[in-house]
């Protein structure tokens, strides 16, 4: 199971850009999002300069332990500058392959362990860049009562909603935890759902 990355919609002002807008650097391509209504330009939007800058900044804010390659967040920008051409080319030609996730055991209160997969920093940045583009597409499809890992929503809002239901007279709560959900979800079904909304086959 992979550790979820925090997803936010931000304008990303300030320093520490992957590539400053006025200075050639790392990593971006000279393409601007066309915002085609058929969604066939998602790949360009993912690799657009500002989107990559935002993705890098968000990964830096999230922090977290290194992945299997041992790269820390402090080394990510240096890596991007040194490997600009090969990094971008691998994304464009479809040869980019994410690294295996690092398996980590987290102790559970009942004595067991929760297995987590920690992605490499560069993979987190790419995941974040993709999420920032496709999140608005799927956000409107989610349940109004879903509060987990969604921009602009929080656990506090979920608590307030529960209090609202309690004040309406509801007195019972059903606590459900799906065992090994990310390991057992039907990925083919999930991919079919994604294909219905994402028409850019490069993504």
PLM feature spans:
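Non-catalytic terminal/accessory segments
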Residues: 1-203
């Amino acid at each position: 199971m992979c550790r979820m990355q925090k997803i936010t919609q931000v304008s990303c002002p300030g320093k520490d850009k992957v590539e400053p807008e006025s200075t050639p650097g790392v990593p971006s391509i000279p393409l601007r999002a066309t915002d085609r209504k058929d969604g066939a330009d998602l790949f360009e939007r993912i690799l657009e300069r500002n989107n990559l800058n935002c993705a890098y900044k968000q990964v830096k804010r999230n922090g977290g332990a290194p992945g299997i390659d041992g790269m820390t967040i402090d080394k990510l920008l240096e890596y991007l500058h040194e490997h600009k051409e090969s990094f971008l080319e691998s994304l464009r030609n479809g040869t980019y392959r994410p690294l295996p996730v690092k398996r980590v055991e987290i102790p559970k209160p009942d004595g067991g362990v929760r297995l987590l997969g920690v992605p490499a920093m560069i993979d987190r940045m790419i995941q974040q860049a993709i999420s920032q583009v496709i999140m608005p597409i799927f956000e409107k499809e989610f349940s109004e009562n879903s509060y987990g890992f969604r921009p602009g929503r929080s656990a506090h809002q979920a608590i307030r909603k529960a209090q609202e239901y309690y004040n309406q007279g509801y007195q019972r709560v059903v606590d459900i935890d799906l065992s090994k959900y990310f390991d057992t979800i039907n990925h083919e079904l999930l991919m079919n759902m994604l294909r219905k909304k994402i028409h850019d086959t490069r993504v």
